[in-house]
Swiss-Prot record:
May be involved in both secretory and endocytic intracellular trafficking in the endosomal/prevacuolar compartments. This is PRA1 family protein B3. It is a multi-pass membrane protein. Residues 1-24 are annotated as: Disordered. Interacts with PRA1B1, PRA1B2, PRA1B4, PRA1B5, PRA1B6 and PRA1E. Keywords: Endosome, Membrane, Transmembrane, Transmembrane helix, Transport. Pfam families: PRA1. It comes from Arabidopsis thaliana (Mouse-ear cress). Belongs to the PRA1 family. InterPro entries: Prenylated_rab_accept_PRA1. It comes from the Eukaryota. The chain crosses the membrane at residues 76-96, 98-118, 138-158, 162-182, 193-213. One of its GO terms (cellular component) is endosome membrane.
């Protein structure tokens, strides 16, 4: 009786290939987190001293609406990082006081990150046995975002928090006398989060160019 020929490990190679393709998005996600962290640190390093922000000797009532508007225009570029921090804190406190809204936003953010932005283009999204194309995935995420932001309490919470933050910024900018303020020497145009956004856009373009022809349409 002839011996059976050895079985070629075809399934093992294909399984290993699929496993090697799964972490394709890991370097891109790590690069995104690294650029985000460095941009936040760079932006925070440009903030003004908080004691200067709350200096009572520099607080006075504006003489007119024109004077208040002029003060706001001069204070905004000078305290921009501090103002963004204040608005972010107001937004964070509002979300922490509403845990359900915070959970909904986190789920929505994770859906965008892991189902579309950093999902490998050669791995289609399969839910309940149905394969979704990239256009269908994008459409579902956009509709879900619209529903969450405009048809739930999340949208009103974000709007009210942002309005409170902007109100604090405008109130401080109108009452802070800017005569003793001066901007640093010509700063680069793209710094901090702006440079991060431009860099992220460039990275996304490079990643899209490097994907195979069978990737996203």
């Amino acid at each position: 009786m002839m011996a059976n020929p050895p079985t070629l490990p075809i399934s093992d190679h294909s399984g290993g290939g699929s496993q090697s393709q799964q972490p394709v998005s890991t370097p891109a996600f790590r690069t995104f987190l690294s650029r985000l962290s460095s941009s936040i640190r760079q932006s925070l390093s440009q903030r003004r001293p908080w004691l200067e922000l709350v200096d009572r000797s520099a607080i006075s009532r504006p003489e007119s609406l024109t004077d208040a508007y002029s003060r706001i225009r001069r204070n905004l570029p000078y305290f921009k990082v501090n103002y963004v921090t204040i608005v972010s804190l107001v937004l964070a406190l509002s979300l922490l006081s509403h845990p359900f809204s915070l959970l909904v936003l986190l789920c929505l953010f994770c859906a965008w990150i892991f189902l579309y932005l950093f999902r490998p283009s050669d791995q289609p999204l399969v839910v309940l046995g149905r394969t979704f194309s990239d256009r269908e995935t994008l459409g579902v995420l956009v509709i879900l975002t619209i529903v969450v932001v405009f048809l739930t309490s999340v949208g009103s919470l974000l709007t009210s928090a942002l309005m409170i933050g902007f109100g604090i910024v405008c109130l401080h900018g109108a009452f802070r006398v800017p005569e003793d303020l001066f901007l640093d020497d010509q700063e680069p145009a793209n710094t901090g989060l702006l440079s991060f956004l431009s860099g992220a856009a460039t990275s996304a373009a490079v990643a899209a160019a490097s994907t195979p022809a069978s990737g996203r349409v």
